[in-house]
Amino acid sequence: MKPAAIVILAIAITVMTTSAEQARPAPKPSILVHLTSGPENPTKAALAFLVARTAIEQGHTVSMFLAGDAVQLLRDSTLDNLAGLGTGKLREHYDIIVKGGGKFYLSGMSSNARGISAAELQGKPAELAPPAILLKLALENERMFTY
């Protein structure tokens, strides 16, 4: 092959590679939603789930860390009955978060104090977690919302 042909081939490969890299969208930031409001504040609780749902719908990876009274939100009776004023129904938000691959972490200490066990979380993408997991998630995720 002649030197000029080699140069042209090298340029063509570079242009094709650069075009393919530019066509690939940048990954969306991962998001952590930290919620401490529970059924006593349905609007704020549903708002946190609405934000997580919206992030899932926009293609973000989402984790939720529920602490304090918020751990009660994953009880089926609460999921089925809680609705915020202008922020929607908790069950609808939860189902979309789950379908989109969202993960829930519940403070183990808060859950224990409110009678929520790992058995009650069976079948849900949720686990009991210590404060060290909250810190780990806060450092790993690119954005964090707190309610």
Residue ranges and their predicted role:
Residues 5-16:
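Bacterial N-terminal signal peptides
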Residues 19-25:
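Boundary at the C-terminal end of the N-terminal hydrophobic targeting segment
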Residues 26, 33-46, 78:
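Short, glycine-rich nucleotide/cofactor-binding loops
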Residues 38-41, 69-73, 104, 110-114:
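Solvent-exposed loop/turn segments at secondary-structure junctions
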Residues 44-82:
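N-terminal, post-signal-peptide region of Sec/Tat-exported proteins
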Residues 82-110:
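A glycine-rich helix N-cap at a beta->alpha junction
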Residues 105-106, 123-125:
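Ligand-binding beta-strand-loop-alpha-helix segment within the catalytic cores
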Residues 126-147:
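C-terminal partner/receptor-binding element of secreted or periplasmic proteins
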